[in-house]
Amino acid sequence: MVDKVKSDLTVGSIPGHFYRLAIPMAIGMVFYTLYNMAGIYFAGKLSTNAQAGIGIGHLVYFFLIAFGFGLNAAMAGLVGNALGERKINEAKLLITKGISLAVVISIILMVFGIICGPLVINLVSEVGSYREYSVRYFLILLSALPAFLISYTCNGALQAQGDSVSMQRALIGAFFLIIIITPILIFGVPNLWLGIGFDGISLSVVICQNLVMVFLLIQVKRSALGLHLTWKVSLTNFRGNYEIIKQMIPGCMSFQMVIIGSLVVQFALKGFGPNALAGYNIGLRIEQLLLLPILGMTQALLPIVAQNYGAKNFQRVRLALYYCCSAGFVTMIIVYPIIWVFGSSVLKVFTPSSEVISVGVSYLRIDGLILPLYAILFSINSFLQGVKRPASIFWIGLFRQGLLNAFFIWIFIGVLGCDVWGVWVGAGVSVFFGWMLSIFIAYKVANKEIGGLWQKSQI
């Protein structure tokens, strides 16, 4: 049965596996980022306040869908480990339990979001129309939570089998659909329908995400491991649930630390007005697009590490980590001149406001300096998830995003009285110290789990 799985990552060329897995993942994430940027673009056709509102509402929503990313990583790691150990029935059971768990978690999160989401938005925003836009955007998006969590649970199961193409196809389709239906929902059809205005942005996301979920469920059903959903399996074997939750929570919380870090930035920027918030949110989307090469590589690293760790091929784990870190580091060095030269031109696509563009350019040029550090941070996160040490990811995130981010931004803004650029510098300094901690933790974990990082060999 294992031979029918899309790819056995315990044999063959490591760079070849990266090439085959990372490119579809990166392409998929390009369209996922463009999918998210579509909302910012169409909001810009309404007002700067609408853009600022979407930025804040999406961040709070992202805090909840971090559970989806946690489930994705947990499924990729656990199913990949099971396949590496040739435990096919266990891998099948994990997929069933993961999807069932995604349904339960999403219902709980929807209730939590309705109660707490508007309170968080009020905390990081000032009274005004952009706060109202944030709350409206967030509350409608909550109805897409089940689809999002199930989609990424399915994606983790497919990634573990070496399938990175299904999510790519789903996201490409979702992007083209969203750019068609969003303007129709916002502005309507001349002489036929007036549209629903701003709320059409979030409603289009709900529609597209549910279609992505249906497609990925079909792909899991068609995969070698299949989909075996029954009430009996879904409601029993709590050990399976425990293993998934144990792997999910630290990864989820590490994503949430990223959101907390962004909310800290939003909180610091609210005193500079909606133009600063809009500039940051547009700049952040552009930066996410530039990070996609290393995000594709680091997502590919997870199933490679997971399968080889499960098969006790520790030297291949080391080689995969080295390859991902070095290739990502060099790629981000190449990307920075692109930011410097073309950043302003890209921002003009989203807004005509010179103040918004100025803020966005300053963010991209300062934060762009630390992009190579992100390559190593993300690589280490995938390595830790693959060797079943996701709790370490949380501690790195808490230290970097939760503590140092707030501390250094306060130093530059509150103590030194810097302008908006002080927020970017403070966040950058926190990334540097988080990078140092991640290297230290990776070294310690590698010594315990795979016999160290520094054994010599050739890829």
Question: Which role does the model predict for each range below?
Answer:
Residues 9-41, 45-46, 62-74, 78, ...:
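N-terminal transmembrane alpha-helices
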Residues 72, 76, 141-159, 167-178, ...:
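Short runs within selected transmembrane alpha-helices of multi-pass transporters and secretion channels
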Residues 51-115, 148-167, 280-343, 374-396:
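Small-residue-rich hydrophobic transmembrane alpha-helices
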Residues 30, 34-52, 121-128, 184-195, ...:
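Helix-terminus/linker motif at the lipid-water interface of multi-pass membrane proteins
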Residues 20-39, 140, 151, 174, ...:
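Transmembrane helical elements of multi-pass membrane transporters/channels
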Residues 1-22, 79-146, 188-249, 305-370, ...:
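Short alpha-helical transmembrane segments in multi-pass integral membrane proteins
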Residues 48-59, 138, 202, 274-289, ...:
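Small-residue hotspots at the loop-to-helix junctions and early N-terminal turns
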Residues 25, 29, 40-41, 77, ...:
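Transmembrane alpha-helix boundary and packing residues in multipass membrane permease domains
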